């Protein structure tokens, strides 16, 4: 008889040498990008990053051939190499007068001895201050190509930040990167806010606010920080959620002594009642196909 107790998952060993800096101004950024990629992949539990001091080969030229034998010798199954610079691009305008932060990188299968990307490399560009976002996007690419699953590193979390004394907590609507970095407060502490939810494309939020004295569902454009109450009827509303296509919102609406579910079309403003029973219906969400 064979008794099965636990499954064993061995993390895939990857090499992520420090990205090359093509100009001195981005030396520290290049180092931080490679470190953040390593942190992202390590947190999944699926990958183990081989320490730099164990590397036999040093990547000193982004265009140089890969010494596969050296990477096999330290049991690396994958290699991520990259280079960073700042340049002015024709297809992308950055506000920084120096230009955009440009990161190019390659992903190699060491045992198959090939470059995983069909065109040899990938290139991302953004404002120089957005290097963390570029690192997360690269980690997403690596994760997808090695697991077949969509990465989640370049994502945001919406939450309610609390501060103040125990009996008078102040709440603010906030967002942050998935790893807790880049916290941004979207509202002040003057009004109670609850239940933030992202739109499918991540550009908007719906949430419950007591700004008008009673709970009402608000919609905010994250880029402009502009917000407005979704339904101007004189009824309390709360617990919103976007539809999968982002074109409507489902929420709870109070009418008299009854609380029912409604959908609101964001394009036409048309409201449709979904329930009419005596019970309180709340915290609804759509199925994946809407």
Residue ranges and their predicted role:
Residues 9-17, 28, 32, 44, ...:
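Extracytoplasmic
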Residues 157, 202-206, 246-250, 290:
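Hydrophobic beta-strand positions that form the internal "hydrophobic ladder"
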Residues 150, 162-172, 188-191, 208-218, ...:
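A flexible loop/linker signature enriched in serine peptidases of the S9 family
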Residues 182-187, 226-231, 270-275:
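A short beta-strand motif characteristic of beta-propeller blades
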Residues 111, 177-181, 221-225, 265-269:
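Short loop/turn segments that connect beta-strands within beta-propeller blades
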Residues 3-67, 80-86:
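Short beta-strand->alpha-helix linker/helix-N-cap micro-motif
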Residues 62-141:
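Amphipathic beta-strand/beta-sheet edge segments enriched in Tyr/Trp
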